[in-house]
Amino acid sequence: YKQEWHKNVILKARQLGFTTEVCIVQLDCALFESKKCALIAHTLHDAKRLFREKTKFAYDNLPEVIRLANPIKIETKEELVFSNGGSVTVSTSFRGGTLQRLHVSEFGKICAKYPEKAREIVSGAFQAVNDEGVITLESTAEGRQGYFFDYSQQAEKDQLANKELTAQDWRFFFFSWWQNPEYSMTAQALPDRLIAYFEKLQAKHGITLTDEQKSWYYSKEKTLGDDMKREYPSIPSEAFEQSIEGAYYAQQFNYLYTQNRIVESLPN
């Protein structure tokens, strides 16, 4: 939050709590700075759920003295408008009016599944944010195309080049699974391929993991399989890796090769 820029793109692992944080920050800005804030989710059901479970829940649990000092003027299932003019709105898009803060949750998913909606967000909601405002895009990866992929790639390149950003440039943030201390479990034996993988992470990227973290990764991978790197990337480039196109049994054959189960044809 302290490193926040005008335009922020956050590539992340799953379940790190960013949307919850944004809901709290937006509520704070609406209450104490009279700012107009909006949060966009990929479905209206999710937008309303976030509003109910994050924003409204936080507001209802504020001390009464704060709520009385700036009471709600308008309340719906998608919006809170306060007497000071500040507001928090959730939706699947936003067009018209002016915003000081905009957050788009799972923008990568929106780009992949609803490309026209993504275009509407870029052409409508982005343009509603004033020059001093803040836009934040947050998502796990969803393929190697679309606005989220393009913004992430360019922002990471700018970061690596130490480019001095303008207000129109995106600032890149990456948060991996191993940065969450909760992603840990009792140590267990690992297959050789994962031992080699973790050794490579340490040698090439300086990422040192505990045995408990490695075991958590192994356990989670058993369920996710080929989607593990997309959902829980260790480094940014992993997030956008794709399985071999057209290889229906790629994972199974990879396993057979690693177990030396592929042999020369046997004689009749």
Set out the residue ranges of the language-model regions.
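Phosphate/NTP-binding elements of NTP-utilizing enzymes
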Residues: 1-268
